Each structure stands twice: as structure tokens, then as C-alpha cells.
Amino acid sequence: MHVKKTTAISALVMFCLALTSAIAQTAPTTAPTPLTAEERESALQQFQTTRDNFLKSIAGLSQKQWTFKPAPDRWSVAEVAEHITISESTLFGLVQQRIMQSPAAPEQRDQVKGKDQMILQRMPDRSHKAQAPEFLRPTGRWATEAELTKSFEDSRKTTMDYIRTTNDDLRDHFFDHPVFGPLDGYQWLLLISAHSSRHTAQIEEVKADPNFPKE
């Protein structure tokens, strides 16, 4: 009986501590600040440009061109396109379901100043190589190029609609990136666009291979 009572008290103490911490973390300190018109427009331009470039890079390819691999350990156009499409919805889900659900921390804004441009400049740079995590690697999720393209366009439209209309305080919520360190919600959105730009360049590398099928 004594053991059960001690355990129950300990559980109650832990619950109270957790509840107190949660209340402290979620108590608003300032009113939410939505994106500025300039921030929306800048992001939307980035997303539109990278969308158009990606779709142009995969348009009109034959099945041989779509599946050609420059080497056994390198991705085909189809595989790169799948990685872009998977990442599109996954990263947007991270913003909505993880980053924007975390407590606002406007005091961290100084930590991410200047990172908007850094993301847009460094992420597309193919001289810095990185390995995609297992859950973002291509596995043949879409049977055809048309199905993949539709999924990408649907995801991109959802993200752009969100940027266009949201009143979320994206600049006050943060999450660490393994390379860039802490980023705010807006910067994570920019990362989606910059990521597709990086891998569109990879598609062009595949197409430039001397053994790439002529038709």
C-alpha cells in the first residue's frame, strides 16, 4: 500500500510539474505577428519560380530518359523527382504539425537573422553533398510521371495557398535544421522551395550525362 501511495504521489507531482511547465511555455507574451506583404510576395515568387523550373526539367521525357541512371549508385530523373515530391509534403507537414505547434519564442528571433538569404543561396549549391534520410528516399511510390507530377502540383499549391493566406506567426516558432541550425517557420518554408531548386539542378546533371538517352 505504501509503495502504491508513493508511486501515485510521485506521478501527481510529475503531472503538476509538467502542467506548470506547459502553462508557462504556452502563455502568450505578445500578440501573434503575421507575415508582412513583402515576406509573402518574396516566398511566393520563390515557390512559383522553383515550381516552373522543376516541371520544365521533367517535361517531355521518354520512359528511357525518365528511368536512366548515370551510375548504379546515382538517382534517375524519376528518383530525383520522387525525392522532391516526397520532401515537399513532408517538410510542409513539419511546419504545420511540429513547428507551429511548438510554443512561440519571439526572443529567439535574433538567432536566425540573415538566414533567409543563406538558405536561398546555400541550399541549391550542389558542391555541398548530403545524404537524404531513409524516409525521403525514392521507392517508386508513383507508377507514372503524370501521377507524380499531379502529387507535386497539389502539394505545391497547398503550400502556396498557405503562404498567401495564413495569419500564423511563422517568425516566432523555431526548429533546428541539421545543417543550418535554428530556423523559424518562414525559413523552413523557404527551405522547401530551395530544396526543390537544389534537386532540379540534379535532374539537369542527369540529363547532361553523355549516356543520357537521346529519346
Residue ranges and their predicted role:
Residues 1-12:
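Bacterial N-terminal signal peptides that target proteins for export
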Residues 10-21:
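Bacterial N-terminal signal peptides
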Residues 23-42, 93-150, 177-178, 210-215:
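Short, helix-capping/interhelical loops that line the mouth of catalytic, cofactor-
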Residues 38-86:
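N-terminal secretory signal peptides
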Residues 43, 47, 148-152, 189-192:
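Hydrophobic packing residues in well-ordered alpha-helices of helical domains and bundles
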Residues 51-54, 152, 156-159:
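Hydrophobic alpha-helical core bundles mediating ligand binding, dimerization, or RNAP-core interactions
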Residues 58, 127-130, 167:
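Short, small-residue-rich loop/turn micro-motifs
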Residues 68, 72-118, 157, 161-165, ...:
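Short, contiguous alpha-helical
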